[in-house]
């Protein structure tokens, strides 16, 4: 992959294209020259005119030509004029076989002064060659042109060459200073850079350079940005390529490109290779719809050989990124190939604040904007989400004609990123507004009455995204896990909207469908993955992978019996019934608070945390739940006496709501669609689906 010559504009020259153009120009010039100078000076006349000349006395010499063209060339004693056109003294006419005898007789009768002769016509060798091979040359040129365009130009027959791009040192650099919220990953990658810059320091103590570094984590957390920072920091060749660039429709191309890429890196060592989205080529062998011997697996096999074939001090490091580490082939992940596997997770409060500070550069913020407060509201957001928040705030500010980004723009930007844009055009009837207000009020009231729920920070009945209204329950700090009581509280306030509809309106709409789906998913996770059911027991009944990998699960039998599946269903139903009972109890005991909340919602449409706290002052809290032990045969011990203060079971935390780590129950985006019922409206309004949880954002949001 040697660097190609470049034009002043920076585009690669195409040597084969230039050669082809010169060949075409030469052919055209040759044809033009032949057309202009290939004639012998004779002018064409009609057959009748030729016979009339032979019958006269002006013919000085004649030549009868036979072969692939039958004609007579005449040399005259005076110019022949065809009307106003002077044909000169050299003319010719053609004839057909039927006139052959008559033409010969006419020539003999004319008895030219210099006589006549016969000749067999033959083409010149070069014109014959040109006419024979010109169509073939045109076809080859057209084919070459099409292939060059299909392969990006200039690489018609280089299918097996790597498509990796060499980092341009003249381009604007991304450095480690531009990466925020991933301090551990930056530290690890900075050490990789030091390996390449000063390998002797590490080799002196017997350390071996890592052969591979795998960056994994959810989308938007900055894996590719980290690779760009390595490219900007390292003063060594940096080759970047996507995993999908290895596999083409031609068999063997992927393996050939892998060989070419690694050979080029070795020739220019020390060097770094970066493969983005490596799961496109490195997924588990023997799985998927392509079978066990497809082109992708051949490419993976070649990559395994190249990684394991590095010499000890080759000074070539492979960095790869993926958000599906669970489907990568085990041989790719073993030590000796990817020696370091660095998780890039969603940032904590400090990381979010740093990220906001990086992306706030160049944006005019109002003096009262507190980025730390924004970071606290953005629990669970990735770096890409936070960058999008500030960009949306800037767009909203420009749209409104202002010059300064204020707190209102940031607040709206967070809601747009979390829930989607507000739907100003959606018209709701008074009955629908009332039902939406009571439904969202039910969610908020139950959340406020629970002992382990995060604070309710916002309730609105304004349609946004796919929801007709929503309730935000946001923790005040980052959490690494959740207790059983915290999850039970989430189930309870998830059922709050359903409980309000059934208890107050004496009817249930299709609106709570998403609530039921989310609550069922949480309950099933508690029973099947977390061992939070005394009936089912402390077993993990789900597979090792949370996400389906098509082909890997095909043909696999369930890991539990039908009786166990029935028991799981019963336990899930029990958890949801208990949650509905708790929500119902809260609504009955706090009906006056609910009515006051609905009245404020109908008047203001949106209530913030301070206004909600004022309304919820009189809420009657639920009593703490009984201590839960998986088996009554096991004794309960005293609360912890070492390592800090701990409240009694049932009041563990008022800052719940953070997704479980490392495998949280995946919750749908707020405002999921409800069941498609003929004649029923959709889109989150009464009669349509639309309550949800924003588990991915680290907040619980119920949306109608």
From Swiss-Prot:
UniProt GO BP: protein catabolic process; proteolysis
Cofactor note: Binds 1 zinc ion per subunit.
Annotated localization: Cell membrane
Topology, Extracellular side: 39-127
EC number per UniProt: 3.4.24.-
Keyword NAD: no
CDD domains listed in its UniProt record: RecA-like_FtsH
PROSITE patterns to which the protein is assigned, alphabetical: AAA
Record GO cellular component, one term: plasma membrane
Catalytic residues (UniProt): 440
Disulfides per UniProt: none
Region entry Disordered, spans: 624-704
The protein's enzyme class: hydrolase
Job description of the protein: Acts as a processive, ATP-dependent zinc metallopeptidase for both cytoplasmic and membrane proteins. Plays a role in the quality control of integral membrane proteins.
Oligomeric and partner information: Homohexamer.
PANTHER family (alphabetical): ATP-DEPENDENT ZINC METALLOPROTEASE YME1L1 (PTHR23076:SF97), METALLOPROTEASE M41 FTSH (PTHR23076)
Similarity comment: family membership: In the central section; belongs to the AAA ATPase family.
Protein name: ATP-dependent zinc metalloprotease FtsH
Organism of derivation: Brachybacterium faecium (strain ATCC 43885 / DSM 4810 / JCM 11609 / LMG 19847 / NBRC 14762 / NCIMB 9860 / 6-10)
